[in-house]
Amino acid sequence: MKLRTLLSATVALGLATSAAMAMDKTGWPESFTVGTASQGGTYFVYGSGFAGIIAEDLGISGGGEITGGPMQNMALVHTGEAAFGMTTMGPANESLNGTNPIAPGLKMDKACAMFPMYQTPFNVTALTSSGIKSISDIPAGSKIGFGPAGSTSDTYFPSMLESLGVDFERRNGSWNDLGSQLQDGLLDAIAFAAGVPTAAVSQLEAQTEVNFVEFTEEEQSKIQEGFPVANFVVPNGTYASQPGDLRSVSMWNFAIANCDLPESFVYEATKAIMGDHERMLKVHKAAKTTVPENWDKNTVLSWHPGAAKWFNENGASIDAANIYGN
């Protein structure tokens, strides 16, 4: 049985290698990077995972790169410093309009949609010992961690909390660092915006008792009045100590590709990711919604021609006017 399994694996690897060698790689890069975010967040795990899948299937070297998150990824992909990246619809829209704080006035229109990822919910986490169980419980002047500077959380969560009347001191850092600061009493709460389950939150609840602070329905409505978000529920069981479903708001995340990359390269890369959903689920549970039918969640970016070709071959109806170069 072991010999049969070994032979099957060898044959499968040989077939994958042969398929990669048979591809027309004219104009393809020799290697690539995927702009992710800080360690401890979903972007780093998800992005490094999808980089590995593309590298394996296409037979070229590639990997995830630690970055400042969606805003920086838009800049890196726009300039071509990173072939691929990950962003949310809010930062993507700001970047297209020239209001990305990394390069104010520059319209980053060379970052194209590649495939849908997942929704990023916004939630606050505090130590149980803090007594913070709701947004209204957050004391004035609280020190709140918002993730890396330029991340989706840092870009939107402070303004969201301000709209709810929360007075706070803003702190930035990687999710892992902020988790340590929370445990050391240097922070009162962390405002997370990341795909769930978030590794840093899972690690935090394994080490100490935490409160998951949800929004009230009124707070959800208030936030939706001023921000490009939708209601979201973090399902019970996402985290081990979660008391039940958690009300939240969320933004969609999309993988992006430099618009000038060869169509055939991005087509094959998209096929590698979207063609085997089970493999992406092994990368991260957030990939549950990385499925073809969510192509229409891109409401901002032009599609890369290679990605659009794959999606239109697999049930999408992406209008030619929304494809880069048309």
Where are these regions (language model features)?
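N-terminal (or domain-start) structured segment
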Residues: 23-94
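Short beta-strand-centered segments that line the small-molecule binding cleft or hinge
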Residues: 93-99, 110-116
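Short, low-complexity disordered leader/linker segments with a strong preference
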Residues: 1-29, 325-326
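Pocket-lining segment of extracytoplasmic ligand-binding domains
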Residues: 89-91, 98-104, 130, 166-261
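Extracytoplasmic
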Residues: 29, 41, 59, 69-72, ...
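Ligand-binding clefts/hinges and TM-proximal coupling segments of bilobed small-molecule sensing domains
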Residues: 140-157, 228-299
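Bilobed "Venus flytrap"/periplasmic-binding protein-like clamshell domains
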Residues: 31-57, 61-62, 120-184, 293, ...
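An extracytoplasmic/periplasmic, membrane-proximal ligand-sensing/linker region
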Residues: 29-30, 177, 184, 194, ...
